[in-house]
């Protein structure tokens, strides 16, 4: 029987999570993409603590875009999460694409975060 798209994403994410782990020195930049919004968190997996977060639902970005499901909105989230991470002294991260393909909104967020100063 054919897998649904959600099942495929979940299987890919579990394979990725076996290899990618955030440490205090190099936390994990985790991305979650829904149909309407995109979310990014910088996570220390050892302490199980979210250090920085940003999404299209943030008060800083809420009214800027007609939809949170665009590459432009993803770029804004990438820049915002990078600025917040750099403000806390986090420069190096490990990228966790959350089982999604590195394309479209995921790629836009990653490139914007890199341009804003995060190293991964």
UniProtKB/Swiss-Prot annotation:
Gene3D superfamilies cross-referenced by the UniProt entry: 3.30.420.100
Annotated spans, Disordered: 1-24
UniProt keyword terms in alphabetical order: Ribonucleoprotein, Ribosomal protein, RNA-binding, rRNA-binding
Domain of life of the source: Bacteria
Molecular function terms from GO: 5S rRNA binding; structural constituent of ribosome
Keyword Secreted: no
Xref: SUPFAM superfamilies: Translational machinery components
Record GO cellular component, one term: cytosolic large ribosomal subunit
Disulfide-linked positions: none
One of the Pfam families matching this protein, by short name: Ribosomal_L18p
Segments of skewed composition (Basic and acidic residues): 1-10
A GO biological process held by the record: translation
CDD domains: Ribosomal_L18_L5e
Role: This is one of the proteins that bind and probably mediate the attachment of the 5S RNA into the large ribosomal subunit, where it forms part of the central protuberance.
Family of this protein: Belongs to the universal ribosomal protein uL18 family.
Complexes and interactors: Part of the 50S ribosomal subunit; part of the 5S rRNA/L5/L18/L25 subcomplex. Contacts the 5S and 23S rRNAs.
HAMAP family attached to this UniProt entry: Ribosomal_uL18_B (MF_01337_B)
Protein name according to UniProt: Large ribosomal subunit protein uL18
Gene field: rplR
